[in-house]
Amino acid sequence: YMFHLMD
């Protein structure tokens, strides 16, 4: 989604 949290 932004970083490596939820794509």
Curated annotation (Swiss-Prot):
Q: Where are the D-methionine residues found in this chain?
A: 2
Identify the keywords attached in UniProt to this record, alphabetized. Answer: Amidation, Amphibian defense peptide, D-amino acid, Endorphin, Opioid peptide, Secreted
From the UniProt record, list the coiled-coil ranges.
none
Task: List Aspartic acid 1-amide occurrences by residue.
Answer: 7
Q: Name one GO cellular component term.
A: extracellular region
Q: Which cysteines are joined by disulfide bonds?
A: none
> Molecular function terms in GO for this entry?
opioid peptide activity
Q: Name one GO biological process term.
A: neuropeptide signaling pathway
For the keyword Secreted, the answer is yes
Where is the protein found, in the record's own terms?
Secreted
Q: Provide the tissue specificity.
A: Expressed by the skin glands.
Q: Which domain of life is it from?
A: Eukaryota
The similarity annotation says: Belongs to the frog skin active peptide (FSAP) family. Dermorphin subfamily.
Functional description taken from the UniProt entry? Has a very potent opiate-like activity. It has high affinity and selectivity for delta-type opioid receptors.
Protein name, as recorded: [D-Met2]-deltorphin
| Organism expressing this protein natively | Phasmahyla jandaia (Jandaia leaf frog)
